[in-house]
Amino acid sequence: MTNMMKALVKTKPEVGLWMERVPVPEVGPNDVLIRVKKSAICGTDVHIWNWDQWAQKTIPVPMVVGHEFMGEIAEVGSAVTKHHVGERVSGEGHIVCGKCRNCRAGRGHLCRNTLGVGVNRPGSFAEFVCLPEYNVVTIPDDVPDEIAAIFDPFGNAVHTALSFDLVGEDVLVTGAGPIGIMGALVAKRSGARKVVITDINPVRLDLARKLGIDHVVDASKENLADVMRSIGMTEGFDVGLEMSGAAPAFRDMIDKMNNGGKIAILGIAPAGFEIDWNKVIFKMLNLKGIYGREMFETWYKMIAFVQGGLDLAPVITHRIGIDAFRDGFEAMRSGNSGKVVMDWI
């Protein structure tokens, strides 16, 4: 195996990413080297491409980016015992310390020392990515490669949707991006009664309809209260999944929640936006922030959803070779795509 590889690198502090030749990561005793077969573009990667304020504060340059992927193990460290060369795998993109209180209590997703693959350390937009053995997840044979490549965002959807009991509940999802759509599908499959998803992007609303979500609402043209009446809802929503990061959508969600309702918040909202806290208080709402995936309960659940017949393939709207990465980023930046999966092989 050569000691150099192709990778998408943030080589300069400006808009864009560049295909470069960089050294293959060195494998430590507890590490696993993975030959990447497919990788997907995340919203985080778009922030890095755009070199916005968050990226400028967060991303060291140069940096190999990307964290949504699947591949095959190419090499294992001398102390690795649970994985072997040739195994199909994906990986948890949050590297946790294992030493803090939350890690020691089995709550690694709450680690205050988390490092992000493709953010704080070299990522998976490359021919090879190196992860600690702890972070590597075996992919069963009945899970397709391209679906395994989007397990990171699917995990965000599963973690958010399953934060609260959904059986018999009416669920509102704000934001029909890929994660919002997958969250709505999980809610529907987990026993929710009514599942309503809102957005203002016609392409994403059409994608939500294509995937079989029953109640798809264009918030720019339809009044949510009217929709609720038309589908027989006499009270507010029991569970809210905020996936949009849009202040108007979040405010509308709070307004439409039933007393005692529960909201899981994944969408990253603009700093300092206002909500009516009196409604939160007098409705006795429960608000819960969501970041990443539970380690590794979320991974087991999302594998089970796929093995149980949940078809996520339509969420992937663009399948391209890695040399066309600019086209993939253009699709993501336009807002008129679902998931974009890039083939490295």
From Swiss-Prot:
Main EC class the enzyme belongs to: oxidoreductase
Metal-binding recorded as keyword: yes
CC cofactor: Zn(2+)
Gene Ontology cellular component list: cytoplasm
Subunit (UniProt): Homotetramer.
Keyword Cytoplasm belongs to the record: yes
Record-marked site positions (Important for catalytic activity for the proton relay mechanism but does not participate directly in the coordination of zinc atom): 152
Entry function: Catalyzes the NAD(+)-dependent oxidation of L-threonine to 2-amino-3-ketobutyrate.
Highest taxon in the source lineage: Bacteria
Full protein name: L-threonine 3-dehydrogenase
Keyword terms: Cytoplasm, Metal-binding, NAD, Oxidoreductase, Zinc
Residues holding NAD(+): 179, 199, 204, 266-268, 290-291
Pathway(s): Amino-acid degradation; L-threonine degradation via oxydo-reductase pathway; glycine from L-threonine: step 1/2
Residues involved in Zn(2+) 2 binding: 97, 100, 103, 111
Cofactor binding, per record: Binds 2 Zn(2+) ions per subunit.
Location in the cell: Cytoplasm
